[in-house]
């Protein structure tokens, strides 16, 4: 959980699971971390915040696997590359010689993180993995080919991950062990190139510009601006603006503004101001 930054406050620590609360000016979040096997941890992420100070510094022989169940996650690699995970996406990355941060543009993200520290895997665990034909080195090799590897989770992977949310609490520690081994077995045999998602990288300039556009239209939500007017005002091409906004927030800018207006109207109705 040190990967999540200084906003983490421990709620409850157990021998198998520890729960933590995150809070900063952008919102709140909760995580539940399970020590599954030596060197392997599984974390449930429930985020309702724009960021959680999750800055991951380079680490040797360390692998991270993320599965997005709901919402969106912005993944940053280096200083200039941004891309976005959506529901059903699975990402694999090595922190070998590189760092990245994660944030949540819509302040809504639910997903699972699996971390594997190869230096902590015992000889006994290696024998178990070998017996089950789980080749972690193959997964790690793919993660090192590029900064970030994202695939659209197939039906089997989605089934495994969804079951991690339906198991009864008293069975969860043992059940997670089984499901993690299943997931690693599938990933070790996965044809990454065939399942690779055609995701888009955005530059820091494009991402920062769209953040300003988002804040502007929210601040002036009662006014109407055309795509062309916004693009000209913020000095970005209309095509790049539309593409980046949809990747960041999940819907076109007009749809986002319409939904935002409806949310304001509903809030005013509840408060008796309309």
Put a short name on every predicted segment.
Residues 204-205, 257-266:
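Short, basic, alpha-helical segments at the C-terminal edge of helix-turn-helix-like DNA-binding modules
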Residues 169, 273-274:
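Residue-level recognition of short, well-ordered coil/turn positions
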Residues 1-59:
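N-terminal low-complexity or simple alpha-helical regulatory segments
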Residues 40, 51, 59-80, 87-89, ...:
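Glycine- and acidic-residue-biased ligand/ion/polar-headgroup-sensing regions
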Residues 156-167, 209-220, 264, 268:
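Solvent-exposed, amphipathic alpha-helical segments
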Residues 185-192, 212, 216-260, 273:
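Basic/polar phosphate-binding segments, predominantly the helix-turn-helix DNA-binding elements
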Residues 44-46, 64-66, 113:
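Beta-strand secondary-structure signal
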